[in-house]
Amino acid sequence: VNKLLVFYGSYRADRMGIRLAHYMVRRFSERGSDVELIDAQAVGLPMLDRMYKEYAPGKAPPAMEALARKIVAAEAFLFVAGEYNWGMQPGLKNLTDHFREEWFWRPAALATYSAGRLAGARASYAWHPTLAEMGMVAVPSTIGVGQVSAALDVEGLPTGSGGEALDKAFDKFAAVLDWWADAAVEQTARKGPPY
């Protein structure tokens, strides 16, 4: 993936998932990708009232305008998603809902996490149809990290058996996203989007 955006959406005081976001940024950078972390809390979009497309050109809030340009320029997306009450993080969902066409025709991968042993699996189930509805191809390979605070240290470096399992799963996960990103770039160059 030449240009990858990694999205993270927790607003909690003790954000454990940021460790996984940093891990993903580092590992994809080591593979040669141009990676940027998009932290929903840092971007600071309000609760959804108006989507980006509902503003006149040049009239969207500056943070929304800047993020729209980054989304359009990206070849692929990676959502680092925590599981909240059997579902998706509200902060990450709110950020994604501000955009629509900007997401179209690119692959998206999911790396989920939780404090418990289920590794964010239920968040993954919620995100797959959402990403598809928003015009992305949700790639079939996912990563789930259970007990995230034990699997990654504060710098996002793997620790213990959970960290070992993550490292072992990463290369296949990244290769699948790379394949879909290459396919999307080639098809867009060859034929262009259907609309």
Q: Each predicted region: which residue ranges?
A:
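Amphipathic alpha-helical interaction elements
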Residues: 9-13, 100, 116
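Short, solvent-exposed amphipathic alpha-helical segments in soluble enzyme
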Residues: 22-23, 96, 126-129
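Mobile beta-alpha loop/short-helix "lid" or hinge segments that flank ligand
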Residues: 36-47, 101, 136-157
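A generic structural signal for secondary-structure junctions
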Residues: 52-53, 97-100, 132-135, 182
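Charged helix-capping and loop-helix junction motifs
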Residues: 91-98, 124
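His-Asp phosphorelay/catalytic-motif detector in bacterial-type signaling
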Residues: 104-106
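Short, glycine-/small-residue-rich phosphate/pyrophosphate-handling segment
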Residues: 108-149, 164-168
